[in-house]
Amino acid sequence: MKEHQCRGGRASPAAPATWLARISVSRGASAIAWTFMLGATAIPVAAQTDDPKLVRHTQSGAVEGVEGDVETFLGIPFAAPPVGDLRWRPPAPPRAWAGTRDGRRFAPDCIGNERLREGSRAAGTSEDCLYLNIWSPKQVGKGGLPVMIWVYGGGFSGGSGAVPYYDGSALAQKGVVVVTFNYRAGILGFLAHPALSKESPNGVSGNYGLLDMLAAFKWVQNNIREFGGDPNRVTVFGESAGASALGLLLTSPLSESAFNQAILQSPGLARPLATLSESEANGLELGADISALRRADAGELTKIAQSRIPMSRQFTKPRPMGPILDGYVLRTLDVDAFAKGAFRKIPVLVGGNADEGRAFTDRLPVKTVLEYRAYLTEQFGDEADAWERCYPANSDADVPAAVARLFGDSQFNNGIELLSAAFAKWRTPLWRYRFTGIPGAGRRPATHGDEIPYVFANLGPSSVSMFGSLEGGAGASDIKLATEMSAAWVSFAVHGVPDQGTKSHWPRFERRGEIMTFGSQVGSGEGLGVSPSKACQPSK
């Protein structure tokens, strides 16, 4: 990815005060459907419509959507606006509204890195951003369809549930209810601060973005029957930071019963996490007066944070803004939890792309052997020589491939290997994949994020302009691959296995290391795409 059923009647009563109690205390073929809403760019507001045609009732009030082969409901609040005194607090219950809310337009995206919401159909950004969107097959009943909830990536610094390539229409046409949502990121989503920890009944702060995710999952549990979904058949799926968050939540007791299955696309697992005290020290860089910080303009606050808190990625150091070991949401490193079997033993589908790292390293000022060695020293210190032996570059021409492999393995592939080994050890159902894409003139090998338009079966103009894997436009081979890949994802959500009714047999990943490859050919085999780190682990 380029740097990247109920009609009429009375509304149900508002959610009780104990809502989210555990958290609040702290192109072409029919398979590829473009059904974007015309004019879906304005901010949604609560409105009394004269003649609502498609209405569903949530616990907070009625919502009007858009009718069609896929019924669409946009901009539904799953939590109260996290503004004012609710800034840097766990998400509070959504406020009830009178009349029928207009659910035909996207709500604002959360404030964050603007580059990460390129193409978004939302009208700008706002701190008031905790909204979700639903795509459901034309209603034939209530509460019987599997649900797929998408968690977008963005390095925990931004993103949007309203970009076109996350449109859920094509997947919904295959018989599932699709949900996307926004969550707080960056300084607004992950600030830890001593004053915030002091005011928390759990004595912690930070991880508000993760709590937003859990709140969205909880809203789905409480309301999705009204949109045709079954709250007992929920598959969460995400990419990059979204997948990383889901992997971390597998180890959190707060995620119990929040979802039934998970799909992790290029997760960044087995990375260091800051402790609460380390993160609180970062937070103090913004100032000691939390009341003043709550009154500050959110956009300006984000800019100040970016100038005062280093945001560059360090392989061996925790993210300056992202999930932390707070002792409440996250209580142990995922490495330790997976080793001990202290994770939710639910079916998981996980994988990555052939050239994960290049999406990041193409922009690095590392082009010569000397620059490469300096980069290794900066990242790994005394272990730089060991890492260079694992990822050698004997000439300047070797450097781009070496640094891309290093980045892809250390940031993505190694964690996937760790998760896979743990699931095999604890005999927990897991399926592995590797996305290679469709070769073509001007196309690079599939890198980070390139699988997304194929998973969503969205190969329209927005995806072509955004993803290098679609350079030159989507052809027949791309359409075929998107059909097969999206069918596998839906099969997993519907049947609990990714090959029910599909063309290719996809065996479970066990100790032999079976992996499904999605590319010019789709098929499974042993040891495909296994990270070089299995034979070369310089830190061991």
Swiss-Prot record:
Q: Does the keyword Hydrolase apply?
A: yes
Pfam families in the cross-refs? COesterase (PF00135)
- Cite a single GO MF annotation: cholinesterase activity
So which domain of life are we looking at? Bacteria
UniProt-listed Enzyme Commission number(s):
3.1.1.87
Active site: which residues? 240, 356, 448
* Region annotation Disordered: where it falls in the sequence: 521-540
Spell out the reaction equation it catalyses: fumonisin B1 + 2 H2O = 2 tricarballylate + (2S,3S,5R,10R,12S,14S,15R,16R)-2-amino-12,16-dimethylicosane-3,5,10,14,15-pentol + 2 H(+)
Under PROSITE patterns, the record lists:
CARBOXYLESTERASE_B_1 (PS00122), CARBOXYLESTERASE_B_2 (PS00941)
What Gene3D superfamilies does this protein map onto?
A: alpha/beta hydrolase (3.40.50.1820)
Question: Which keywords accompany this UniProt record?
Answer: Hydrolase
Which family does the entry's similarity section mention? Belongs to the type-B carboxylesterase/lipase family.
What biological function has been recorded for the protein in this entry? Involved in degradation of fumonisin B1. Catalyzes the hydrolysis of fumonisin B1 (FB1) to aminopentol (HFB1).
Q: What is this protein called?
A: Fumonisin B1 esterase
Q: What is the lineage of its organism?
A: Bacteria, Pseudomonadati, Pseudomonadota, Alphaproteobacteria, Sphingomonadales
